[in-house]
């Protein structure tokens, strides 16, 4: 069962060494029925060539729902190659039973000019909309707070989505780490389809120097105000899942039992903190 009114999900990045069936078992052992699978885990689904139909069977047997496949990278750097990649990934997502495809922007310091940001974003969304809609998928646009990213602000994503009349297809990912880095005050709970949660507990790293490698499970030392962000989203009407997405090596080195215990502790802290 879910913990109270808080819906949790697990991104496969929480335990990238676990095979799909093991990962789904981890989720089920925690009472979590929603997961995200990824296309960037070496030796694992999807890079190991597992057919989408096999994923669908494994997921159904586990009794869980795949809320997203994460991710189409550099989606706003549109090209014929990106279109082919998007179609292939969307086909896989639909055939595996996933509900959505996460869309990650270019993050290399290119395409960051104000005018080109909007133009690149709208052209990509316009091209992606029929690809996703025809397969019954949502597109989850995930701004990244890094200073070199071509899409840092959710407000820019919403503006572009509205410009292409894409609100029926596209939602936002509110990532608590990237929201903190971007320094954006505005929340868009009614436009948000998924929330990624992770913490930073290193007291020495400056916000501008925070990277994925600093992202751990949320604990009492969290510097990102995860509880404040989540409470604000919930108070404004967000009722969707909170998906754990830590990238730090000290999380990835945990064995299945250790990561389960750590997740259980983090879930309890978050649930208590946001429902108090």
Where do the PLM segments sit?
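Histidine-acidic metal/acid-base catalytic patches
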Residues: 1-9, 17, 21-33, 56, ...
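Hydrophobic alpha-helical membrane-association signature
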Residues: 51, 85, 121-124, 262, ...
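Short, well-structured secondary-structure segments
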Residues: 33-39, 65-69, 101-103
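Glycine-rich, proline-tolerant flexible connector loops at the mouths of alpha/beta enzymes
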Residues: 36-60, 107-113
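Short, basic/glycine-rich phosphate-binding loops at helix/coil junctions
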Residues: 65-70, 138, 208-209
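The substrate-binding groove and active-site-proximal loops of carbohydrate-active enzymes
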Residues: 72-80, 216-220
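Active-site acidic/histidine proton-transfer and metal-coordination neighborhood
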Residues: 21-25, 61, 65, 77-172, ...
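Active-site beta-loop-alpha junctions enriched in small/polar residues
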Residues: 11-15, 38-42, 71-74, 106-108, ...
């Amino acid at each position: 069962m879910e913990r109270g009114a808080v819906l949790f999900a697990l991104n496969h990045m929480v335990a990238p060494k676990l095979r799909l069936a093991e990962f789904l078992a981890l989720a089920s052992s925690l009472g979590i029925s929603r997961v995200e699978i990824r296309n960037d885990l070496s030796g694992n689904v999807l890079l190991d060539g597992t057919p989408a139909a096999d994923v669908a069977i494994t997921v159904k047997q586990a009794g869980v729902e795949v809320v997203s496949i994460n991710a189409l990278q550099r989606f706003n750097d549109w090209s014929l190659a990106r279109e082919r990649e998007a179609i292939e990934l969307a086909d896989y997502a639909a055939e595996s039973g996933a509900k959505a495809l996460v869309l990650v922007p270019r993050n290399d310091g290119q395409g960051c000019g104000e005018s080109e940001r909007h133009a690149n974003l709208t052209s990509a969304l316009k091209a992606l909309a029929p690809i996703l809609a025809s397969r019954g998928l949502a597109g989850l646009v995930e701004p990244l707070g890094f200073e070199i990213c071509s899409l840092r602000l959710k407000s820019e994503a919403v503006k572009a989505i509205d410009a292409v009349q894409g609100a029926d297809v596209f939602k936002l990912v509110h990532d608590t780490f990237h929201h903190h880095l971007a320094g954006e005050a505005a929340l868009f709970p009614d436009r948000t389809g998924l929330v990624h949660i992770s913490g930073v507990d290193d007291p020495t790293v400056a916000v501008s120097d925070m990277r994925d490698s600093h992202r751990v499970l949320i604990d009492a030392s969290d510097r990102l105000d995860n509880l404040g962000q989540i409470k604000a989203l919930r108070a404004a009407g967000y009722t969707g899942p909170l998906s754990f997405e830590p990238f730090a090596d000290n999380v990835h080195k945990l064995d299945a039992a250790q990561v389960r215990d750590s997740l259980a502790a983090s879930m309890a802290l978050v649930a208590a903190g946001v429902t108090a």
